[in-house]
């Protein structure tokens, strides 16, 4: 375990009977693979250190703060034959895994991922914090290239968007309407899928 807070690092290491490292370089060099769970602004530099050290890594989402950084990271990982897995864990949620066999020919999908305001992850907007999970699920379920995207977002309490809506049109004709908010009164997770022969709501 490595953390910039030495006391917290030792506390976690003691709790799980593992070693507390004094530097990120020492931790990376001692590992077979690395799980990078740091604020988004540090993803690129930390992941690059892992790749340079030849370590496979699991990187919390979003991959980086910018598309340019993401492309550089992917290119470097490919060049060094490093496994770079991004933490889009919702795709492996048991509900999504159960749903998957029933998705045959989706025509319209409505997705809501709403949550109350929190001081967590304010360095990125709601699209890369919450909606990114639903975009990943949609791409996985629809299995078609994206043709068109119309999106809008608004800042309410943060410097980045707190509310966002995206309408995604796929090449196969499926349309998805995706809503994300981190300024809602209560938490809501809902997916509604309309197909020619069925309606699924979870």
What are these regions (language model features)?
Residues 18, 53-55, 80-83, 174:
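A short helix->loop->beta-strand "cap" motif at the edges of active sites that frequently abuts
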Residues 87-94, 115-146:
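Mid-domain beta-loop-alpha active-site segment that forms a flexible
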Residues 1-13:
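NAD(P)-binding Rossmann-fold cofactor-contacting core
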Residues 136-202:
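Contiguous beta-strand/loop segments that form the cofactor/metal-binding neighborhood of enzyme cores
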Residues 16-74:
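Beta-loop-alpha module in the N-terminal Rossmann-like domain of NAD(P)-dependent dehydrogenases
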Residues 64-121:
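A contiguous active-site-proximal alpha/beta segment in oxidoreductase catalytic domains
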Residues 22, 38, 59, 86-88, ...:
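Short loop/edge segments at beta-strand edges and connector loops
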Residues 23-25, 113, 154:
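Conserved SAM/SAH-binding loop
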């Amino acid at each position: 375990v490595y953390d910039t807070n030495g006391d917290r690092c030792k506390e976690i290491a003691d709790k799980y009977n593992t070693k507390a490292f004094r530097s990120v370089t020492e931790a990376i060099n001692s590992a077979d693979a690395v799980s990078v769970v740091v604020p988004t602004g540090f993803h690129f530099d930390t992941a690059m250190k892992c790749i340079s050290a030849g370590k496979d890594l699991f990187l919390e989402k979003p991959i980086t703060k910018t598309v340019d950084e993401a492309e550089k990271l992917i290119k470097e990982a490919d060049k060094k034959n490093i496994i770079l897995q991004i933490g889009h864990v919702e795709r492996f949620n048991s509900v999504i895994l159960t749903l998957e066999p029933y998705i045959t020919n989706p025509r319209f999908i409505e997705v809501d991922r709403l949550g109350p305001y929190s001081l967590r992850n304010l360095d990125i907007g709601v699209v890369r914090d919450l909606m990114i999970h639903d975009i990943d699920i949609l791409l996985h379920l629809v299995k078609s290239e994206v043709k068109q995207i119309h999106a809008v977002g608004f800042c309410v309490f943060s410097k980045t968007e707190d509310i966002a809506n995206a309408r995604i049109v796929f090449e196969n004709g499926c349309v998805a309407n995706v809503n994300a908010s981190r300024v809602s009164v209560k938490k809501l997770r809902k997916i509604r899928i309309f197909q020619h022969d069925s309606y699924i709501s979870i």
